[in-house]
């Protein structure tokens, strides 16, 4: 049954959903990587698609920008459409010197300046972490394809234009491997409703060095990230068989 933000029916979504921020990127993923694709939702032009990858039913849907937006979609997918696993696939900024442009980052944990998980967790700090099995499957998929990855703690920021530039240096000191805007929210929603989640990002810019990738470079690395995400789903199926 349709929800206020997703005009689909039960069964339209697979149990695994890949979620980029940009709905047009969701369309690209569906058209490039999936077969037998069907559009299953389009409210507010937040497109969702279901198809198959190597015979495995998989869905992809945009989640918008920031924790409030992605939390709405993740909640409805899990509660109302029976989704069991969400993989966020997006971009992030780097602060550490050893994290380079176009690196693929796997968010094992997600620190944040948002208060949403404290609200969920009775006012206490909640350690927003990815599902270990999904992390392991993504690492194994990357190794099989010869794609190097950085695994660690990422930071989900409420502000894209943060006036406190010095805080990025603090992130560097604490070993943050990537800065984005959604993972902590998705991990919190997954924990609240008994689902599993993972975030995989490509580094589009280095915040402290002022470096940025071109659109062509972003696309190449994005495709590598998508291959990791999709292959990790198949590895997860094998683990659970």
Swiss-Prot record:
Keywords: Glycosyltransferase, Transferase. The record marks 218 as: Important for catalytic activity. It catalyses: a purine D-ribonucleoside + phosphate = a purine nucleobase + alpha-D-ribose 1-phosphate; a purine 2'-deoxy-D-ribonucleoside + phosphate = a purine nucleobase + 2-deoxy-alpha-D-ribose 1-phosphate. Pfam families: PNP_UDP_1. PROSITE patterns: PNP_UDP_1 (PS01232). Homohexamer; trimer of homodimers. Catalyzes the reversible phosphorolytic breakdown of the N-glycosidic bond in the beta-(deoxy)ribonucleoside molecules, with the formation of the corresponding free purine bases and pentose-1-phosphate. Belongs to the PNP/UDP phosphorylase family. This is Purine nucleoside phosphorylase DeoD-type 1. The lineage of its organism: Bacteria, Pseudomonadati, Pseudomonadota, Gammaproteobacteria, Vibrionales.
